[in-house]
Curated annotation (Swiss-Prot):
Function: Escorts unspliced or incompletely spliced viral pre-mRNAs (late transcripts) out of the nucleus of infected cells. These pre-mRNAs carry a recognition sequence called Rev responsive element (RRE) located in the env gene, that is not present in fully spliced viral mRNAs (early transcripts). This function is essential since most viral proteins are translated from unspliced or partially spliced pre-mRNAs which cannot exit the nucleus by the pathway used by fully processed cellular mRNAs.
Molecular function terms from GO: DNA-binding transcription factor activity; RNA binding
Short sequence motif named Nuclear export signal and binding to XPO1, residue ranges: 71-82
Transport is among the record's keywords: yes
Region feature (Disordered): 24-44, 82-102, 141-179
A biological process from GO: mRNA transport
UniProt name for this protein: Protein Rev
Amino acid composition bias (Basic residues), ranges on this chain: 34-44
Motif stretch (Nuclear localization signal and RNA-binding (RRE)): 35-49
Alphabetically ordered keywords of this record: AIDS, Host cytoplasm, Host nucleus, mRNA transport, RNA-binding, Transport
Domain notes: The RNA-binding motif binds to the RRE, a stem-and-loop structure present in incompletely spliced viral pre-mRNAs. This region also contains the NLS which mediates nuclear localization. These overlapping functions prevent Rev bound to RRE from undesirable return to the nucleus. When Rev binds the RRE, the NLS becomes masked while the NES remains accessible.
CC terms in the record's Gene Ontology section: host cell cytoplasm; host cell nucleolus
């Protein structure tokens, strides 16, 4: 019984708020610029009053203290950050090349995970014409960097005129007849 009364009260409040908003239509655009500006200013002021009235009519209840969100926030507030160990100052070096890799592996296993050096995947490779994060050679298409594989520069004007100075790119389906 109490739930139905609350629902009817909520519907009555919503109808009242809707009626208040309908009493404030957007001003029609006849008149001078000053008149239109004043109408917009008065409508904006009236709108602020309606919003304040609607907020006083319908207030949102506070969520109960035992809500799952509140419990999750309390758990997050209870977390602490542990002290991180100091990084090692020197790594042991072995003189033998066969034991070198094994010694490094043992050193990395003994270090905490946060101090093991990890190279980013997006670091540029040492070889020219290789894409980042890839071991495949890049085939430059027409209109690329302007050089062929031997480092000779290509002129796009000569290519368009039909006098080819660069060899065709393999695997792209472009040949002299299609140009």
């Amino acid at each position: 019984m109490n739930g139905r009364a609350d629902e009817e009260g909520l519907q009555r409040k919503q109808r009242l708020i809707r009626l208040l908003h309908q009493t404030n239509p957007y001003p029609q655009g006849l008149g001078t610029a000053r008149q239109r500006r004043n109408r917009r200013r008065r409508r904006k002021q009236h709108w602020r009053q309606l919003v304040a009235l609607a907020n006083s009519i319908y207030t949102f209840p506070d969520p109960p203290a035992d809500s799952p969100l509140d419990r999750a926030i309390q758990r997050l507030q209870g977390l602490t950050i542990q002290e991180l160990p100091d990084p090692p100052t020197n790594l042991p070096e072995s003189s033998e090349s066969t034991n070198n890799n094994q010694g490094l592996a043992e050193t990395y296993n003994s270090l905490p995970a946060i101090w093991v050096r990890v190279d980013p995947r997006s670091a540029p490779g040492p070889c020219k014409d290789y894409e980042r994060d890839s071991c495949e050679r890049v085939e430059r298409l027409v209109g690329g960097n302007g050089t062929d594989r031997q480092g000779n520069t290509c002129s796009s004007k000569k290519d368009q005129a039909g006098g080819r100075t660069c060899p065709p790119v393999r695997g792209s389906g472009i040949n002299r007849e299609t140009l």
